[in-house]
Amino acid sequence: MAFLCSSLPSSSSIAIFGDPNTDGSSRSYLSIPSLKLRFRPVAASSHICAPAIDKSTFVISESVSEDELWAAACLRVRTFNELNPSAYNIQDHRRYLAEREFEALKERTSGKREGFTRVACINATLPLSQLSSSFEDLCSACKFSDGIEDRVVVGSLDLNQCRWLPDEIAGTKPEGIGVDFARAYLSNVCVAKELHRNGVGYKLIDKSKRVAGEWGITDMYVHVTVDNEAAKSLYMKSGFEQETAEPAWQARYLNRPQRLLLWLALPTSPIMSM
């Protein structure tokens, strides 16, 4: 399936498996300072054969280096934008988009983006040695070094601790003082098309739950377009349930498919409940 590439702005959650972009086309907005967050929903993709991957070599972790952030930005550009390979200066355009996403990602994860308490870029990576020559394009675009070996970012999402995401439906939980620190949203969820059907989306969401719990988050949200059945299935199987739907007039005004807001209650840690 084509992964949602969730919006942070890349849609909140819509990006995990590549739904069309947030405006209803097959692309999705980059999450950059001047643009809204992007989400790409998961879309089924039956024509892609899942490669044989040693799943024990997956590492799901928060990005800790600029090299890894750059690789994640390149994966998002590759996932959220349908670019004609034969177009003039296509490589220059891809790099331009990646640079914008990279700078926006650095701004968010460093705590400099107004309105966000904290943002983590969570990536799924594989050793370069695990990927065959048939993955040359992916490896070339999304490779980085962790200081020990070369690895490739094959999935990514943002965990955003904030009240709401720009131009998106806001969650209602928790209420009261907790809204300032205990609510989070997933966005820019994406998985390389070559690695679909390897459980990467579930691994990313599971990791985001653990990180959110460490932050004291009690309520996690994600957005998904109403017709993205694959994305909804992914989130529902991960424990999310529908809280509300975007008003049709708002979707028309923003010139995009109508979205659903999904909610997940996270267990309260013993320390938090004392």
From Swiss-Prot:
* CDD domains according to UniProt: NAT_SF
GO CC annotations, alphabetized: chloroplast
Annotated transit peptide = 1-65
The UniProt record lists the EC number as 2.3.1.255, 2.3.1.48
Which residues are the active-site ones?
Answer: Y235 (proton donor)
For this entry, list what GO says about its biological process.
Answer: N-terminal protein amino acid acetylation; peptidyl-lysine acetylation
Superkingdom, taxonomy of origin? Eukaryota
Q: In which tissues is it expressed?
A: Expressed in green tissues.
What biological function has been recorded for the protein in this entry?
Answer: Protein acetyltransferase with dual specificity triggering both N-alpha-acetylation (NTA), with a large spectrum of modified N-termini, including methionine, alanine, serine, threonine and to a lower extent valine and proline as substrates, and epsilon-lysine acetylation (KA).
What is the protein's name according to its record?
GCN5-related N-acetyltransferase 7, chloroplastic
Which lineage? Eukaryota, Viridiplantae, Streptophyta, Embryophyta, Tracheophyta
